[in-house]
Amino acid sequence: MENFVISNIKARQVLDSRGNPTVEAEVYLENGGFGRAIVPSGASTGSGEALELRDGDKERYGGKGVLKAVWNVNSKIKDVLVNNTSDLHAVDQMMCELDGTENKTNLGANAILAVSLATAKANARAKNLPLYKYIAEIAGTEDEMSIPMPMMNVMNGGEHASWATDFQEYMIIPKGAGNISDAVRMGAEVFHALKEILKERDYPTTVGDEGGYAPRVRDGNNEPLECIKLAVERTGYYFGKDIAIAMDIAASEFFDKDHYVLKTNGDWKSADDMINWYDWIINNYPVVSIEDGLAENDWANWQIMTERLGNKIQLVGDDLFVTNSKLLKKGIKEKVANAILIKPNQIGTLSETIEAILLAKKAGYKTVMSHRSGETEDVSIAHLAVGLGTGQIKTGSLSRSERIAKYNELIRIADTNSNLGLVNPF
């Protein structure tokens, strides 16, 4: 438990990478410790996520302002925390008790998480530790610290790119890399080669929210896999050995009652059709991870998919679990998925984020730290991934500086700590 005392808290409204308002918070300690954090925002969100408090005033930012959340930090949260301990678990507990709701409806998860992350940074600075070491210390994961394998989003679809494809993300995993610098280089080389492939097919090379290319492909949801294959081969890497693929289907976004309705062509597919499709994909392409392959409420079919494909591939629950330990416990009990995506703003405090990661690891589930589509220059998730030893990280493409910032921070961390090796979970 930290013996530091919080002397001041301040929040303000700033912008995320999509030009939408978000919350930035600063925490000051009596001993001079200081932390600043900005929270991100999602596009495709799970229904069980903690509440992101927006103003709803159509006269300002189309109703997306966060002045209410900022006011909550500068008044209610500040009144409770100033002159109190900066111990992270205590701070998070006090904020949750002050909010008084399960999904942080009153104060807003965006207000609470901003203060939670800023407090962690202030404590780390007060102890003269990098954030990742402080996180490992409070979580008891010092022996698990490592550089995560990146999942790099190179083609966007779904909600992130106006339904250019039905599937939301096509990612490359530079699993043949020996260190994070090589991983970033390999990813960048494939990303640039992919641009040339798309140009040759007369596709535009504009990018989506997360920096991946977002062309409206002509030949269906498998065409991006072919384009990536050609890009990998053009760079001289071995498809499958050096570069593998991960996909985020985000199936909840096109689920309708008991069917999956593809928005690009109107086809209706059953859950069994979707599972068969994934089975075909992993037998024809080096796809090693599928996220949200079925809808968040389609639990019975998630069980079937896990039974059929769980020994072949990583099945990641994002909307399914929303970084919530209660939902993860249900998934573990019912043998649903075998990995969890971790997004701190889905649950709203750093303490609860750590709890979900530790629970997943204990159950043998893999963990993937993740950004959001509305990101910021804040690099906290790079430190969380290292300090908590998540083994994998999703932080976007090899373009857009809010994505690159996380890769650069991982390079810095590795450069200053030679004991931290790049993990290859595949």
Where are these regions (language model features)?
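Mobile "lid/hinge" segments at catalytic clefts and subdomain interfaces of large enzymes
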Residues: 48, 140-141, 145-208
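Beta-strand segments within the central parallel beta-sheet cores of soluble alpha/beta enzyme folds
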Residues: 93, 130-153, 242-246, 289, ...
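Active-site-proximal beta-alpha loop/turn segments in soluble metabolic enzymes
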Residues: 169-180, 205-221, 250-264
